Amino acid sequence: GWDKTKKYSDDKQVDNIEDLFFEFIRVAKDVQAKVIIGENVAGITMGTAREYFNRIVNGFGDIGYEAVGKVLNAADYGTPQARQRCFFVAIRNDVMDDVGINFMNMDSIIYPEPHNKQPTLRQAIEDIENDPEEEQMLLDFVQGSFQKKWIELLPFSPPKHRKPSDPEFIEINPKQSMFNMIRPAPDLPCPTLTQAGQKKGLSGVFHYNSNRKLTIKELKRVMGLPDDFKLQGDFDQQAERVGRMVAPLMMK
């Protein structure tokens, strides 16, 4: 588990950090689990947010745990998505002693080695048979929205991920806006999915060969979910829920 992560996504601390983390520590202290795993955005390890990272480690120490945190990329563990997240692992001190783990070797024992090859977006979604009505709904939405102007700048099937804020579009887009609207490269892992997978958002990942956002089936594949995984709500609610998930294959 963990608390909300948005305020550290861009390596900047906003809001009051006296938040759900301390409730998480309180519950951990009461439950006294042998091992606790927490997940947060990679930005928590950088810049001003690093102080919060250290407070997390020290907070676990105060309740009798040794904790480490490390940024992992879901693409290194079988997920067709470059999704970096910081995983904290806290082990109760008596358990550390029983199994012969100490702080010096904790990192190397706990975190798995990356796989040799990262799966690509094309490999993940090219065989999907989408609902034609859902595809058309997404295409129609772009044609009738502000997205159309920007996504049509970006070539299909690019060799690298493309954005309207790329330098070559500086004359058209001098403010370098729409920096989170992405035409992904099909032969690389997909960029990080966020709640911006909603059809209404100006940011988020579009299809590599079509002027639309990814369908729910495609989003599930990119997150590493089974095809028969059930999501509730309308399109935007389902897309948002996928974007907020921890990649299952990474956790496995």
Give the role of each language-model region.
Residues 140-252:
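C-terminal target-recognition/interaction regions appended to catalytic cores
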Residues 1-182:
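Class I S-adenosyl-L-methionine
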